[in-house]
Regions:
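Ligand-binding clefts of soluble mixed alpha/beta catalytic domains
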Residues: 1-534
Length: 534
């Protein structure tokens, strides 16, 4: 159908004829691409735009917008093909009964390319989401800007980016990449809060392999350059590596269950039968910390013992694994968790870990999600690579994020808390509300072994001269330093800790702390915005 005339013999001067014409047009809108294009999409292991929406939203809840719009381009013979919808499906619906807005690019029509009308549809649904204060989910599967429409198509990207920015910190924004996203198209998901990619079928890159080969001579494939694994493990662009499209859509549904509708809405509250008496499961935490300070453990085990039902939704699990971030519930209420991971790089902070945690902390603060920080950090990762690539500036992002946060902040020091890394990880000095520590905590400028080399240099030389067991002397002096200088009781004496608890009491202590902080009110000095060290 290339104009407004009916293709059937319906009598449009009667109500019955008009209704029949509407039915025909609606059928054309939902089957605009044709069976052949749909079969090609399925052959690639990909769902169609409408199938994705149907799986994402509650059954029967989708209300489509602008299904009858068509492009206005006449260049390059485009006037001969003007399908309804113009390569994107937009509308509203519900997830777990809560209202959301959604758009899903349709690769079966013009390769999902973004032209003037497709851009207008996305902009319109974004405006609606912002106006009504509901999350927006974008499902991307597009070849990029529609070259037949030139600068008009590019301009629509700019308008989308501006709305992404306006919505940032106001409504949750989730991007699900189910196919290619190239060139300028990648910046919209980059501006959203969470990016989900599908293994083997989704790619994101600013410049494609062919251009890279021409300009630099570098030979790289699409998957290696911008595949889902690359962006989940190396670049950190993506927050979750989905095994397939249903997995990606299910992750988005689960993620939304932890988030409010907007920055002024209350967090969702789920039924909880949390008991405030110590349980046998709680007591298992009393044996989680090894006697040797150099022996690692999995901090996720700690997390699972202190949150409701042991359920923890991790984000960016493959990127910067030395720090763990994600969502859980305590007493049925959402919390954001930031935890050093001794199982990876001994839990040290590096550039990637700092930026990962900083972005997460700022998201939680924007949407009034309390933050629980679990600390076991020996310091910053040393090395010229870190220094030369900006650990000072980029590492300060996490410090900035904690210092500006006004949500409830609860910190528990599990073991090591050394040097500047101790301050950065949700310390009392940065504004944390409740700071607790296990008796295994060590809080000092540096660890015992490092301190021995500075403080006990003469004693070590004397031991060497006397033919003593230098290793044993070092160990004894390090233990003395840890006991006399790094003991958590010293920090508690100075009021830098609000309490020292046995590990088994952590779940109950956190629950009570978050209860006490529900009515917290804090604000920052009036300003247009801060200048985070980007």
């Amino acid at each position: 159908m290339t104009d407004n005339a009916p293709t059937s013999g319906h009598d449009l001067y009667t109500t019955a004829g008009k209704l029949a014409d509407l039915k025909d047009r609606y059928h054309e809108a939902v089957t605009a691409s044709g069976e052949t294009a749909i079969e090609k999409q399925h052959a690639k292991g990909k769902m169609t735009a409408r199938e994705r929406i149907d799986l994402l939203l509650d059954h029967g809840s989708f209300v489509e917008l602008d299904e009858f719009v068509r492009h206005r381009t006449h260049a390059f013979g485009m006037e001969k093909k003007r399908p309804y919808g113009d390569a994107v499906v937009t509308g509203t619906g519900t997830i777990h009964g809560r209202q959301v807005a959604v758009y899903s690019q349709d690769f079966t029509i013009f390769g999902g390319s973004l032209g003037e009308v497709a851009g207008e549809k996305i902009i319109k649904v974004m405006d609606l989401a912002l106006k009504t204060g509901v999350p927006i989910i974008g499902i991307l599967d597009s070849g990029g800007a529609r070259i037949q429409e030139g600068v008009v198509a590019l301009g629509k990207y700019g308008e989308i980016f501006r709305r992404n920015t306006a919505a940032s910190g106001v409504i949750p924004q989730i991007s699900i990449i189910c196919g290619p996203a190239a060139g300028g198209a990648v910046y919209s998901p980059a501006l959203t809060d969470f990016v989900i990619m599908v293994d083997k079928t989704s790619q994101m890159f600013v410049t494609g392999p062919d251009v890279i080969k021409t300009v630099t001579g570098e030979d790289v494939g699409m998957e290696e350059l911008g595949g889902a694994l690359t962006h989940n493990k190396i670049s950190g662009v993506s927050h979750y590596l989905a095994s397939d499209e249903p997995d990606a859509l299910d992750y988005a549904r689960t993620l939304l269950s932890f988030l409010p509708d907007n920055n002024l809405a209350e967090l969702p509250v789920f039924e909880s039968d949390v008991q405030l008496e110590m349980s046998d499961a709680d007591r298992k935490l009393n044996t989680i910390i090894p006697d040797s300070p150099n022996q690692p453990y999995d901090v996720k085990t700690v997390i699972e013992h202190i949150v409701d039902n042991g359920d923890f939704l991790e984000t960016q699990p493959l990127f910067a694994p030395n720090i763990v971030v994600g969502f859980a519930r305590v007493e049925g209420r959402s919390v954001g968790i930031v935890a050093n991971q001794p199982n990876a790089m001994a839990g040290t902070l590096n550039i990637e870990a700092g930026e990962k945690a900083a972005r997460f902390v700022r998201f939680c603060d924007a949407f009034s999600i309390p933050i629980l920080t679990l600390v076991d950090v020996p310091g910053y990762l040393p090395g010229t690579d870190q220094e030369w690539t900006g650990v000072i500036r980029r590492g300060a992002k996490l410090l900035y994020a904690y210092a500006e946060a006004t949500v409830p902040l609860v910190t528990v020091i599990l073991r090591k808390a050394y040097g500047g890394a101790y301050i950065v990880m949700g310390s009392k000095q940065l504004g944390a509300d409740i700071n607790l520590a296990w008796p295994t905590a060590e809080i000092a400028v540096m660890g015992g072994q490092g301190a021995v080399n500075i403080l006990y240099r003469n004693e070590i030389k004397a031991a060497e001269a006397a033919g003593e067991d230098v290793a044993a002397v070092r160990t004894r002096l390090a233990n003395e330093y840890t006991y006399n200088v790094a003991s958590p009781f010293l920090a508690a004496e100075r009021g830098e800790l609000d309490g020292i608890i046995e590990p088994a009491a952590t779940r109950v202590s956190i629950t009570k702390a978050l209860r006490a902080l529900r009515t917290k009110r804090a604000s920052l000095p009036p300003k247009k915005h801060g200048n985070i060290p980007l």
